[in-house]
A protein has these predicted regions:
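N-terminal Rossmann NAD(P)H-binding glycine-rich loop of SDR-like oxidoreductase domains
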Residues: 1-23
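SDR active-site strand-loop-helix element
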Residues: 6, 30, 69-75, 113-119
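Conserved glycine-rich Rossmann-like NAD(P)H-binding loop of the short-chain dehydrogenase/reductase
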Residues: 25-33
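NAD(P)H-binding glycine-rich loop region in Rossmannoid oxidoreductase-like domains
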Residues: 36-39, 43, 47-96, 100, ...
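Phosphate-coordinating loops and pocket residues in cytosolic domains that bind phosphorylated ligands
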Residues: 92, 115, 134
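Catalytic loop of short-chain dehydrogenase/reductase
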Residues: 130-136
Length: 136
């Protein structure tokens, strides 16, 4: 099976890539910066920043011919966020880019798009007595 993974050097992404490779999957790894953390056996390594390249043209090659896209790339909480408008940046990367990726995957005939969200998806408070609903 041929799978593209965004955020392939992130906390979840690199574990996922290792697991997929151990199962003999072909993996296209999309990373923001080149890194030695990825195994050499990935099928394709593509360096690109989803937050900066609004054309997403480089993704056509990454998504072409794959059966599954697993989107793990995200802007996660950082204690020293240097953005002047962090909420806007979170929404751009975690919401807007995700929508573009899902649409592109659909356009290219990708059979499955798997989205792993970030820890902040439901806000700041998790109450054990109140499960999250679609309205939260």
């Amino acid at each position: 099976m041929k799978i593209s993974v965004t955020g392939a050097t992130g906390f979840v992404g690199k574990a996922l890539v290792a697991d997929l490779l151990s199962k003999a999957c072909e993996v296209n790894a999309l990373v923001r910066q080149s890194s030695s953390e990825l195994p050499l056996s990935v099928t394709q390594l593509v360096v690109g920043d989803l937050a900066l390249d609004d054309s997403f043209s480089f993704l056509r090659e990454v998504f072409s011919g794959v059966e599954v896209v697993v989107h793990t790339a995200a802007r996660v909480h950082m204690m020293n966020d240097d953005s002047s408008v962090p909420l806007t940046e979170f929404r751009k990367v975690n919401r807007d880019v995700t929508l573009v990726l899902a649409r592109l995957a659909s356009e290219l005939g990708v059979k499955r798009f798997v989205f792993l969200s970030s820890i902040k998806v439901n806000g700041e408070i998790t109450r054990a007595s109140h499960p999250f609903t679609p309205d939260d």
